[in-house]
Swiss-Prot record:
PANTHER family: NADH-UBIQUINONE OXIDOREDUCTASE CHAIN 4. This is NADH-ubiquinone oxidoreductase chain 4. It is a multi-pass membrane protein. The chain crosses the membrane at residues 1-21, 34-54, 62-84, 89-111, 118-138, 169-189. GO terms for molecular function: NADH dehydrogenase (ubiquinone) activity; ubiquinone binding. Its main location: mitochondrion. It comes from Protobothrops elegans. InterPro entries: NADH_UbQ_OxRdtase, ND/Mrp_TM. The lineage of its organism: Eukaryota, Metazoa, Chordata, Craniata, Vertebrata.
């Protein structure tokens, strides 16, 4: 059920990040030099999740692994325990909560019309449902943290705090962001561009679907304009 996927990605996955924030406050801050292996492990886990996304053929699996990769960045930022990193982690959890929920919603919109989640079988929607393609484009741009979204602000905070902590982590972080952009554009091009492979009569989009997408994207853009509400 799509509602379960949306709640799982948007809320329940972030509860783990909140729990780590609370637990890190209990640990002694004088031993922070020991945290570098855990930071590298979190970033390496994000890269592995991103590489897994690149080889997915199932749309929902790709979005689910995308959520895991973003949580790797959140964990790496939380471990540092600086004000910038904690602000970036909190902002990224909120931003990715909206983004991943919107992606699952769009995947369900596609599934209801094609009855398949295979990427190669859902292509050609830009000819049939151009407004849905617009929502796909906006959501994927948010997923790869393009300005002026909150995703960009949060990843910038995380990147700067990680670089100040250990400059060599920028290699892992940059590689993770590069692969994120690759699979996001691959997902968009695979599901929207090219000739339509299915001959079924496609049902037009409903107002409720556009409203649902607007309620994901508009709050995220509004928070991006005033990030001090959460940072």
């Amino acid at each position: 059920p799509i509602a379960g996927s949306m709640v799982l990605a948007a809320i329940l996955l972030k509860l783990g990040g909140y729990g780590i924030i609370r637990m890190m406050q209990v640990l002694p801050t004088t031993k922070t030099d020991m945290f570098l292996p855990f930071i590298v492990l979190a970033l390496w886990g994000a890269i592995l999740a991103n590489l897994t996304c690149l080889q997915q053929t199932d749309l929902k699996s790709l979005i689910a692994y995308s959520s895991i990769s973003h949580m790797g960045l959140v964990v790496a930022a939380i471990i540092i325990q600086t004000p910038w990193s904690l602000s970036g982690a909190m902002a990224l959890m909120i931003a990715h909560g909206f983004t991943s929920s919107a992606l699952f919603c769009l995947a369900n919109t596609t599934y209801e019309r094609t009855h398949t989640r295979i990427l190669i079988l859902t292509r050609g929607f830009h000819n049939i449902l151009p407004m849905t393609t617009t929502w796909w484009l906006l959501t994927n741009l948010m997923n790869i943290a393009t300005p002026p979204t909150l995703n960009f602000t949060s990843e910038l905070l995380i990147m700067s705090s990680l670089f100040n902590w250990c400059p060599t982590t920028i290699i892992l972080l940059g590689l993770s962001m590069l692969i994120t952009a690759s699979y996001s554009l691959h997902m968009f091009l695979s599901t929207q561009m090219g000739p339509t492979l299915l001959d079924n009569q496609t049902e037009p989009t409903h107002s409720r679907e556009h409203l649902l997408m607007a309620l994901h994207i508009i709050p995220l853009v509004m928070i991006s304009m005033k990030p001090e509400l959460i940072i």
